[in-house]
């Protein structure tokens, strides 16, 4: 939503209130004016039913706190994307069981929202028990860079086991892909042999 943070939050609250109202069978044929089309509001139903998580982009600690409060009020599953200042709220994120989607090469501020981003964000979040997931800034064509980028997080304190989970098991479990993401009986998996450290640029 365009405008201030307060306006964006108000808009989100309105959308979820209307989506929840529309879920009631007795309201299906009502002519009440809604904040979005019925088709758009129905798209929110799987979130309200906790079938899928809501992914919210939030980088500032204050915005992350507001996202946590919103998810608690709505009783929905939440994933925080960005989380440049997630290290400041590692405890509350872990307590609430909220996973975070982070870009490990986001060490320099790209906006005022990311002024306090740091390389060891992933390590600090993991130390507190937060489920960390790596992404390539939302650009699918950069997915090939995730493996060496995970090496940056390792260089700044994240264990190799945790980095591997951030690329495999954690995204799979967070988004409901129950039969992939780890090596175990009954799971679908590929086994890859590397010529060296898979998190460096050199091995093939």
What are these regions (language model features)?
Residues 1, 201-204:
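Short, intrinsically disordered, charge-balanced linker/junction segments flanking boundaries
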Residues 1-78:
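Polyanionic/metal-chelating signatures
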Residues 14, 66-69, 88, 120-127, ...:
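Alpha-helical scaffolding segments of alpha/beta enzyme cores, especially the outer helices
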Residues 36-37, 56-60, 82-84, 111-118:
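A general structural motif
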Residues 43, 88-89, 121, 182:
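Short acidic active-site motifs
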Residues 53, 94, 99, 103-196, ...:
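His/Asp/Glu-enriched, well-ordered alpha-helical/loop segment
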Residues 78-84, 101:
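Short internal beta-strands
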Residues 85-95:
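Active-site-adjacent beta->alpha loops and helix N-cap segments on the catalytic face
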């Amino acid at each position: 939503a365009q405008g201030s943070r307060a306006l964006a939050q108000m808009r989100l609250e309105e959308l979820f209130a209307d989506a929840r109202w529309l879920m009631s069978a007795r309201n299906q044929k009502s002519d009440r004016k809604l904040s979005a089309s019925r088709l758009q509001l129905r798209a929110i139903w799987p979130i309200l039913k906790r079938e899928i998580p809501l992914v919210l982009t939030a980088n500032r600690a204050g915005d992350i706190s507001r996202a946590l409060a919103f998810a608690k009020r709505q009783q929905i599953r939440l994933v925080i994307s960005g989380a440049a200042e997630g290290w400041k709220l590692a405890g509350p994120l872990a307590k609430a069981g909220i996973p975070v989607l982070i870009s490990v090469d986001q060490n320099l501020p790209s906006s005022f929202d990311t002024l306090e981003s740091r390389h060891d964000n992933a390590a600090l979040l993991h130390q507190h028990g937060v489920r960390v997931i790596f992404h390539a800034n939302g650009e699918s064509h950069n997915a090939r860079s995730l493996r060496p980028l995970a090496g940056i997080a390792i260089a700044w304190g994240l264990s190799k086991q945790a980095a591997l989970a951030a690329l495999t098991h954690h995204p799979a479990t967070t988004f409901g892909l129950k039969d992939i993401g780890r090596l175990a009986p009954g799971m679908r998996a590929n086994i890859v042999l590397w010529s060296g450290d898979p998190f460096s640029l050199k091995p093939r």
